[in-house]
Amino acid sequence: MHVVVVTGLSGSGKSTAIKAFEDLDYFCIDNLPVPMLPEFLALCEKDMPDIHKIALGIDIRERKFLKDYAKIFQDLEESGYRFEIIFLEAATDTLQRRYSQTRRVHPAASSQSLLVDAIHQEREQLRALRSRATRIIDTGTLSVHQLKAMITRTYSMIGDTELLSIQVLSFGFKYGLPFEADMVMDVRFLPNPYFVEALKNLDGRSEEVSSWVLRWTATREFVEEYGALLLKLIPLYIREGKRYLTVAAGCTGGKHRSVVIAERIAGTLRDHNYFVNVFHRDLHLE
């Protein structure tokens, strides 16, 4: 049984994530009281054997969550359950803007507190849980559709026999580092097609830009050597029980060089029969 706990900061996209898992045929429950979790999983195994994938949305609205989750998660692990924690977050100003747009009340807010204080309070309360997360996703630069697509790509092929799911991500340094990245490539040393007038308004998915970037010896050598490094490291990650690996390639704007490199690295890994998703985070920002 594959169990995913979706949690994180209020306003960071938990409901969107749960809907994405629902579309992937996960059995989904939002705000299940944490003390009921062991009993619920035991019931599924006993009376609902067709349920193999479960996604649970849990946050501070469930009052006993912060008090009970650590012991309950530990007990479940010792009982042999395989589960992971996805922690969603975003910058404080992003969360403020989202709450202002929806006019919803933050669950940690009171009539005497400001929204920003409620966000800081929740962030501090969830700090320990964040440190236990299997995956941390910063949704600040993602639209609702992009977050849903990211989860769909990552989990659509995951089953009980899957060893490692790999995501190769392109991004622009000018928009910030991707917090979910396990490894980051800085490819700003490569020749930049942005300064070629015929290529400036294209992106790295186009044949024209890809061919131009890959024409340089430095590019080809980098792709070959970094790909070889990953092929050596991935079996070690699998041996340690890692289930998800995010490799990020960054250039200045996230439109040209990083996109080409991400596609090539993903191709190298696919050639060796690894399941790989590619996500170009900042294409829409340029």
From Swiss-Prot:
Signal peptide: none annotated. It holds the Pfam family RapZ-like_N. GO terms for molecular function: ATP binding; GTP binding. ATP binds at residues 8-15. InterPro entries: P-loop_NTPase (IPR027417), RapZ-like (IPR005337), RapZ-like_N (IPR053930), RapZ_C (IPR053931). SUPFAM superfamilies: P-loop containing nucleoside triphosphate hydrolases. Gene3D superfamilies: P-loop containing nucleotide triphosphate hydrolases. GTP binds at residues 59-62. Keywords: ATP-binding, GTP-binding, Nucleotide-binding. Belongs to the RapZ-like family. NCBIfam families: PRK05416.1. Displays ATPase and GTPase activities. This is Nucleotide-binding protein Sfum_2066.
